[in-house]
């Protein structure tokens, strides 16, 4: 299995992420984080919400894979517990997660993904990535019946 987390961000919280990357390898899952922050995104965020959202879509579009499970993290989307999250990931070999910038996703981008919410609360990118990585590991623990999830 391969899980890739794409985010509009300048950097990742490496220490904790590294821990979850190592733990996911136990389940033969490569967990990768890719931070994207093109120059046009920095400029677009200063102009308008619409331009910012468009720049996020342009940054993410090359990574949308019709053969993968594409999941956009969105605060108003479906949410569930860790067991529901594990069911969503089960039986997929390639999973791409997308975390938009401050202005969220364009509606058109969301049509190409399954939207999922980690919480009704807003998180910084760093916290969202850590929570997502932990939940990916927890989901793998559930799928493979490892006691971590209890």
What is the predicted role of each segment?
Residues 1-27:
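N-terminal beta1-alpha1 ligand-phosphate binding loop
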Residues 2, 93-101:
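Loop/turn-to-beta-strand initiation segments
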Residues 6, 32-34, 116:
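General small-molecule cofactor/ligand-binding pocket signal
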Residues 8-10, 36, 75, 100-101:
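Cofactor-binding loop segments of dinucleotide-utilizing enzymes, especially the Rossmann-like FAD-
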Residues 17-18, 82-83, 129-130:
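Conserved strand-to-helix beginnings and helix N-cap segments that scaffold or border functional pockets
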Residues 32, 37-96:
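S-adenosyl-L-methionine/SAH cofactor-binding core of RNA-modifying enzymes
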Residues 104-108:
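Short, glycine/polar-rich helix-capping loops at beta-to-alpha or helix-loop-helix junctions
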Residues 109-150:
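Structured adenosyl-cofactor binding patch, chiefly the S-adenosyl-L-methionine
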